[in-house]
Amino acid sequence: MAKASFGFPAAALRAQALGEVHSRPYALVTTPRVIFQLAFITEGGSIVDHAVLSELSRARGIAPPGRDANHHAMPWGQGTLRWERHTEFSTYFWDAPAPERFGGEVPIHPFGDGFSPPGLLISGIRLEIRPDTPEAREAIKAFDPTSLCYSETKNGQAVLLTDFRQNGDGLTQILVLDRGMTEAGTGALVQRLLDIETYRTLAMLGLPLAQSLSPEIRRTEDGLTGVTQRMKENVREKADEMLAEITRLAAELEAGAALSLYRFGASRAYYGIVQERIRTLSETPVPGYETIGTFLERRLAPALRTCQSVEERQANLSRKLARATALLRSWIDVELERQNSALLNSMDRRAKLQLRLQQTVEGLSVAAISYYVVGLFGYLAKAVSHELPVDPGVLTGLAVPFAVIGVWLVVRRIRRHHEEGAHK
């Protein structure tokens, strides 16, 4: 057992699976401390983030992260700058010693003029951890009392205060009063609070889209109602026109549904993360104040229900449009079958008429050809009349039935030959 034991071949993804649980370690946070976290929507993916981090790394004289990296940390000033890549956004976290008073200026930080944002800012947070002292509690006055969330957590080891409003820098301010937490416990609490603020903002992105889609869905519903009312009047001669209108309405609906599919799904996922983080806070309410959980639930839940309602309206309307389309197509198919039947009957009548005409022409042809044949026979009889004991006129008359029968047989044989060739 001195050598490396159990050295079996490992599955291809084993190392990645084992390392995933350690990919987001909590930062060890001391008290007092101020933390800034900015979240950016990054449409360019990690390429843009890598360019920003490479520039910051060169300025600090350290190696930049690898191109495939999803997280990176570097020393910056009196703290650490941490970057993490998520599905549609990236976060930049930096901590430093807290200023003398809550909300005080932090003159040196990595997000100054030399910082190139990788995308549009979606969330900005300033979180301060301070010892629970009478001086620190004076900071309660800095929050808006109409939306102040004030609670205890970690069995009374910490006090949480925030009003979810933004300061002059556009950052949501959060104050944590420390009553004896460990550095690891403080780091875990800080990460939960940062996640709650970041993901609750992302979860709300679906609401403006839902509000913009609602009038469009209403117009589509009204359009469908108009078409179905016309269908109820049994105006089948306008089925093509109504089908075109239904198709246009369905195209508009599907365009909106495709636009909202990802956003609504992401909002549900982000809302689930917020709810999970709130549960892990295990807040104890302070009498007279709301907890973070109850405050956000009262505001996030209606927004998510609005998104869900729009999704359900889209799905129901899509089914109604499909049923109306199927009914109109059945009308059109029945009308096409009726027209085809009428066309076939007309073609059948035309074929019968053509056959009678052909038979008439054949009869006339037999008479005409027989006439010429008899005439030729008459000329022949006259030419040899001096050698015949019978009058040429009598011979010509006797030749008439034979000529007619012979020509008729020839014409019949030719027609039968043509019919057999057509069937092959």
Language model features with spans:
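Signal for well-folded cores of large energy- and translation-related assemblies
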Residues: 225-228, 232, 275, 365, ...
